[in-house]
């Protein structure tokens, strides 16, 4: 997947608008997420490994908030010949267009249905795997429980839900420590103080992370019997829940 360098916040902007997954972001997204999210490549690769283990023949897989299709591609490579369908859903037309190009670059017998839609409007059915890869944190908090419930109801017994998120920590000392570690990670990847500050301002009204306890409670209350964090680096984590 080709990507330009992320310089969206490299110059002083008089008025910072809320972050959007628009054409500008879609064009630099791979570079942006690689330099901003520690462990992203490992998360993507392991999502494919989970697919190999959990996806059952003739079932559906849902990548909710699919962006450029990295998770979908990782899954598709692992489930050839199983007669499954993947539903890759994103509400950004710019992301869907680039995802279409990325998927077309690889031959596969697995059908991918690309949908430009709100993930809250998608019917989940016959699902052996659902992925929410840095997606839930952008939904209004009051909509998150209902989405998890609908996912659970549409999953097959033994199905897996993978949720990757930035985390909020109830302990202020830990929150500050891991925030600082993440900022150092971004600096080490070439982001300036101006870029870091302006992007933080753009995100503050649209991204609201939950704590690990909130995630676990939400999953348990909506029926999932098994839950674990399988990956964490600083304030970013990926979790699995099994029906």
UniProtKB/Swiss-Prot annotation:
Enzyme class of the recorded protein, top EC level:
transferase
List, alphabetically, the SUPFAM superfamilies matched: S-adenosyl-L-methionine-dependent methyltransferases
Keyword field = S-adenosyl-L-methionine, Transferase
Recorded superkingdom: Bacteria
Q: Where does S-adenosyl-L-methionine bind?
A: 40, 65-67, 90-91, 118-119, 133, 200
What's any GO biological process attached to this entry? tRNA wobble uridine modification
GO MF term set? carboxyl- or carbamoyltransferase activity; S-adenosyl-L-methionine binding
This entry's Enzyme Commission designation comes to 2.1.3.-
Matching Pfam families? Methyltransf_25
Q: Which reaction does it catalyse?
A: prephenate + S-adenosyl-L-methionine = carboxy-S-adenosyl-L-methionine + 3-phenylpyruvate + H2O
Cross-referenced PANTHER family: CARBOXY-S-ADENOSYL-L-METHIONINE SYNTHASE (PTHR43861:SF2), TRANS-ACONITATE 2-METHYLTRANSFERASE-RELATED (PTHR43861)
Q: Give the similarity note.
A: Belongs to the class I-like SAM-binding methyltransferase superfamily. Cx-SAM synthase family.
Subunit structure, briefly?
Homodimer.
Q: What biological function has been recorded for the protein in this entry?
A: Catalyzes the conversion of S-adenosyl-L-methionine (SAM) to carboxy-S-adenosyl-L-methionine (Cx-SAM).
What name appears for this protein in its UniProt entry?
Carboxy-S-adenosyl-L-methionine synthase
Q: What is the lineage of its organism?
A: Bacteria, Pseudomonadati, Pseudomonadota, Gammaproteobacteria, Alteromonadales
